[in-house]
Structures are given as C-alpha cells and as structure tokens.
Regions:
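Core alpha-helical transmembrane segments of integral membrane proteins
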Residues: 225-308
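A generic alpha-helix preference that emphasizes hydrophobic side chains
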Residues: 15-18, 45, 146, 293, ...
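Hydrophobic alpha-helical transmembrane segments
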Residues: 197-205, 231, 258-262, 288-291, ...
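Soluble extramembrane regions of membrane proteins in the secretory/endomembrane system
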Residues: 21-242
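Short, highly charged low-complexity linear segments
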Residues: 206-220, 252-256, 354-363, 381-388
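Bacterial Sec-dependent N-terminal signal peptides
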Residues: 1-22, 386-404
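Residue-level signal for alpha-helical transmembrane segments in multi-pass membrane proteins
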Residues: 11-18, 268, 301, 329
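Generic detector of multi-pass transmembrane helix bundles and their immediately adjacent loops
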Residues: 271, 282, 286-404
Length: 404
C-alpha cells in the first residue's frame, strides 16, 4: 500500500519536472523583419527566418522572397499573374551584407519554442528548400514571403500559436495598407499605377490574419502572440540598424502635374488662336491614345490574370479602350465622331458625380484627368461638322440661244 502511495505521489511530480525541464536544444529560431527599401518591389519590407545551431556552426537564413529575373518568360507570366517565387537558404552574413548595401534595417525576434518544436520547424524548412519543393506561386496580398514564414511557424512547429488583435476596430482595406507604405516612401507615381491597374478587390477590409501579409504587421502580431500559453517572442533586437533616408520633396506628383495640365488645356480650349487649335489637335491625339492604351491594359489584365487583384476595375469607366482607334482620327470633323465625344462627355460627368459611391478608391490624381477629358470631349463634340461635297456631280449647261 505504501508503494502505491509513493507512486501516486511521484507520478504528478514526474510530469511537473518534465514540463519544467529547460530547453537543451542548441537550435535557435528567429524571425527577421527588414525595413522598406527605395525600389518598388522593396517598398513594403521583407520577412525571413533565421536558424542558428551553435554546435554545428549553422547560421542560415530561409528566404521565401527570391525569383528569377533572367527568366525569358517572366514578363508574360507576370502579366498573367503567374509569379513563381522560391525559398532560398544562405548564410546570415550574406543576408546582412545585402541589406546593408541597400541601407535597410533588420529587426530580429527570437521565438520561444521547445527543442522538439524548433527541430520540427528546421526540418520542415530543409525539406521545403529542396529543388523539387522550393518553388511556389506568389500572390502579393495572400501568399507571399511573409505569409509563408508565418504559416511555417504556425503549422510546422506543432505549437498552439494564438495572435491578438493588431488592427483597429474599423479595419483598413488592403489598398489603405498599401497606400501607407507608398506615401511614406514618396512613391506617388507607383501609387497611381497600382491604383489604376488593381481593381476593387483591394478595397475589401482586412482581417487580423490578412493584415499579416505585410512584414511590419507580422512582426507586430508576433510581439503579442502566444505559443502554448506563453509569449512566443522572448527577445527583440536590431540585427542591423540603419537610419532611414526620408524621400526627397518633389512637386512633380501626378496630382500636381495633371492639375497644371488641366489649367493649361482649359485655357487653350477657349482660345480661337489657330496655333492653339493646331496644338490641341496634336494634344488630343496623344492624350486619347494614352487613355485608350490604359483602358486596353486594364481590360486585358482583368481578363487574363489568374488572380483577382485586377478584376472589377472601375477605372475602365473613364479610360475607355475605344479611345485608342479614335485617337488616330480625332482631328476629323465627322458626325459620328461628334456623337462619340458627346457620349464620352456624358460618361465622364456621370463617373465624376458617382465618384464617392463607386466601391473602389480612385486615385485623387484621376480628378484633373477627368476634367481634361470633359473639356476636350465637350469641345470635340460641338465642333462644326464639315459637309461632304459629292464626289460625282454632273454639271448641265443650258444655252439661251434659240435652236435653229
């Protein structure tokens, strides 16, 4: 009986001591968050996983953000939304040198995992880095280098990872989050291009998990995350500290340039000077040609991309693809051309009136463009029509002389 009592007393102590047993693993896993860079592809920052093993002298970085620039079909694949990225692994020193050369900081978060959990993650990363496993289809806001790193930590460690709320009560949209980085980096023209080509799927409000497609938001999520009821991050430090360079001030933003152009074209449109009218003929040809090209690109990306980011794009309501052929005959004074521009004028006014009701955030630089379209289509729609002279006419002359 005493033996049973002793066993019953020692049995729970065995599990308590096992649970309290310190991690004797020499593995160290950390998340690396890189600050935004000057180039568009680096504007949103970057994420990677660092694995260190002091006993074997291993200090490697696993990076899901590499792709092949030299692929001859890269542009065609990019247009279709087929962006093949890969997991690459290389030394931590090489990683730091790369970001030092780009003048970008690196923040490191040490993850508090058991020895078994760290080994599982390390093994999964090694398997994922094999040539037959390393490639994946990249989708900017749903499956990228940051979401891959998060999913490996959550799914491959075996730990029960929980994230606390990191977004405000009124959640931002994907476009709001993207704009934050573009504005901070002074990427005004890139912001316009993104807003023109990406449809209203980007205007959906993000969930807590979806916000972590951005490196800073994953870092913020890990700061307050738990793993098996304890803090997931034990320590946070600067692996590479570089002061960010503020973007240089410039007036040459899309809004300023297009607003100035709107004023100039508006004044010239009311001029009766022949040189001004000749200039406007050339301007209209180029302007509507560019609008038509933008419309063709919008519709093409909407139709052929396999993802959804370019679908349901309301910018097609003002950048009409039909402008492309019309641009070559814009100077002609024809009835059908007059009717076309009257229709364009009405459509442009309707788009401007419905601006705040469109379920897509339209870039503010589009407003002066709409003004230019409205002015030029109004004047083109009210030009005097040149009457055609019949090509074949028969002139009959009658003589007043009496017939003898």
């Amino acid at each position: 009986m005493k033996h049973y009592r002793l066993i019953s007393f020692l049995f729970p102590l065995f599990f308590l001591s096992a649970a309290a047993q310190p991690d004797t693993s020499h593995l160290r896993i950390s998340l690396l968050t890189c600050s935004p860079g000057a180039e568009l592809y680096s504007t949103f920052g970057h994420t990677a996983i660092r694995v260190t093993d002091s006993t074997r002298g291993i200090d490697m970085v696993y990076n899901y953000g590499t792709f092949d620039y030299d692929d001859p079909a890269f542009l065609a694949k990019f247009t279709k939304g087929i962006m093949v990225y890969a997991l690459s692994n290389y030394s931590f020193q090489d990683f730091l040198q790369e970001y030092q050369s780009e003048k970008r900081s690196v923040i490191e978060q040490d993850l508090q995992l058991t020895g078994d959990q760290k080994q599982r993650l390390y093994t999964a990363l090694q398997q994922n880095a094999l040539p037959q496993n390393r490639f994946y289809n990249y989708y900017f806001h749903t499956d990228n280098c940051t979401t891959r790193a998060r999913d490996m930590i959550v799914q491959q460690t075996g730990a029960s990872v929980g994230f606390k709320k990191i977004i405000p009560e009124n959640p931002p949209t994907f476009r709001n989050l993207i704009h934050t980085y573009l504005d901070k980096g002074g990427q005004n023209w890139s912001k316009l291009g993104i807003d023109l080509l990406l449809g209203n799927n980007l205007d959906e409000k993000v969930t807590n998990d979806q916000a972590m497609f951005l490196p800073d938001y994953l870092m913020k999520g890990l700061d307050s995350a738990t793993a098996d009821s304890h803090s997931l991050v034990t320590q946070k430090q600067m692996a590479l500290s570089i002061a960010p360079e503020p973007p240089s001030f410039t007036l040459m933003t899309p809004l300023f340039v297009f607003s100035a152009l709107f004023i100039i074209i508006g004044l010239l449109s009311f001029s009766t000077n022949k040189r001004a009218q000749l200039f406007l003929n050339v301007f209209d040809s180029i302007f509507f040609l560019l609008l038509g090209l933008i419309g063709v690109v919008i519709i093409t990306l909407w139709a052929i991309r396999i993802d959804t980011v370019c679908r349901d794009n309301f910018n097609a309501g003002w950048a009409l693809p039909t402008h492309l052929p019309v641009a070559f005959v814009v100077y002609l004074k024809r009835k059908w051309l007059q009717q076309y521009f009257k229709a364009v004028f009405v459509l442009t006014l309707l788009f401007a009136i419905c601006w705040w009701f469109i379920p897509q955030q339209i870039n503010t630089a589009v407003a002066p463009l709409l003004g230019i379209i409205a002015i030029r289509s109004y004047f083109r729609g009210n030009l005097p029509i040149k009457k055609r002279t019949p090509k074949h006419t028969t002139n009959l002359s009658y003589s007043s002389k009496p017939i003898i």
